[in-house]
Design a protein with these regions (language model features):
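Active-site-adjacent segment of FAD-dependent monooxygenases/related oxidoreductases
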Residues: 2-74, 78
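A generic "binding-loop/recognition-motif" signal
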Residues: 15, 34, 87-88, 122, ...
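Short polybasic amphipathic segments
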Residues: 37-42, 95-101
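Short glycine-rich anion-binding loops that position phosphate/pyrophosphate groups of nucleotides
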Residues: 45, 121-123, 270
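Conserved FAD-binding catalytic core of PHBH/FMO-like flavoproteins
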Residues: 73, 77, 90, 98-240, ...
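A structural signal for the hydrophobic beta-strands that form the central parallel beta-sheet
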Residues: 82-84, 118, 256
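Short loop/edge segments at beta-strand edges and connector loops
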Residues: 84-86, 92
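Conserved mid-domain beta->alpha element of the FAD-binding
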Residues: 150, 236-289
Length: 289
């Protein structure tokens, strides 16, 4: 289902190692696009390239939705069972018991397990319960920058409007636009910008201001983002936060992994890779013990 708040993912060596360890790397490469360089779009229309490494070295662009669906398919093929549209409101840590219900105030059903891994994201319910334990450290910092998804469609003949093997960046000081390719030769673009201030989401209140802003700062996008106005005012402005906590485990019953343990901003390109690296460590521990 379209959410209008997606940032394409970038897979680097940290992530590939985790997938190789569990035998999923070849299947995931099939849905990725190799990206060997940055394409830097300057305000005067010039285009510069910065290669990431030696010839043949590349990171991979992955659609978040496509990756999620592929990972579910691969897991189901190995016998993993998924339950969708289920709401977990609380957890009893000592017994690894989840509490499920339709509403936070309604009747809950008890679900007991041997172990629970909290992979429930930056605003984790599992971590929220762990925060009430003594000696549990937690910090949360919201950035003053938000983001909004925009879209570059493929041409009518299916060809891409810009180079699919580049991570496209339009750097403009304290705000920027970036774009990564999808399998259908479209691009998912993300506008990162302050929430408030002179050049901010707060300041772009109507079509005239938006079109003028893009004409001034991103002039070469005029012909490649045909639905700029629709996308900008339809898609939500989302927020960015850094979250840290420790410890990530409770006895031998509960463990946090991924963003529930360590959410970071997307600029480093390592949020997903750090999450997969948790699986590298988990897999090593499973082999050891």
């Amino acid at each position: 289902e379209f959410s209008g708040r997606s940032i394409n993912l970038v897979m680097s060596n940290r992530g590939w190692k985790a997938l190789e360890d569990v035998g999923l790397d070849e299947e995931i490469r099939k849905i990725g696009i190799p990206v060997d360089k940055r394409a830097i779009h300057l305000q005067d229309g010039k285009l510069n390239y910065q290669y990431y490494g030696k010839e043949g070295e590349a990171i991979f662009s992955l659609s978040r939705g496509v990756l999620n669906r592929k990972m579910v398919d691969l897991a189901e093929a190995e016998g993993v069972e998924f339950f969708f549209e289920r709401k977990i409101w609380d957890v009893t840590l000592a017994s690894a018991t989840l509490w499920e219900g339709e509403t936070e105030q309604g009747d809950w059903t008890e679900l007991k397990y041997d172990k629970v891994f909290g992979a429930d994201g930056a605003f984790s319910r599992i971590r929220h319960r762990m925060q009430r334990q003594s000696m549990f450290d937690y910090s949360q910092e919201f950035m003053k920058i938000g983001y909004k998804e925009l879209h570059i469609p493929a041409n009518a003949d299916g060809s891409p409007k810009i180079d699919i093997h580049s991570l496209h960046i339009w750097p403009r000081g304290n705000f920027m636009l970036m774009g990564l390719a999808n399998l259908d030769n479209s691009f998912t673009c993300t506008l990162f910008m302050p929430i408030e201030g002179e050049n901010s989401f707060e300041s772009l209140t109507n079509e005239e201001k938006l079109v003028s802003f893009f004409a001034n700062y991103f002039p070469d996008t005029k012909d490649v983002i045909p639905d700029l106005v629709r996308d900008f005012f339809r898609n939500p402005t989302s927020y960015l936060a850094i979250m840290k906590c420790f410890p990530w485990t409770f006895n031998d019953k509960i463990a946090l992994i991924g963003d529930s343990a360590h959410a970071i901003v997307p600029f480093y390109g390592h949020g997903m890779n750090a999450g997969f690296e948790d699986i590298t460590i988990l897999n090593e521990l499973m082999q050891q013990y």
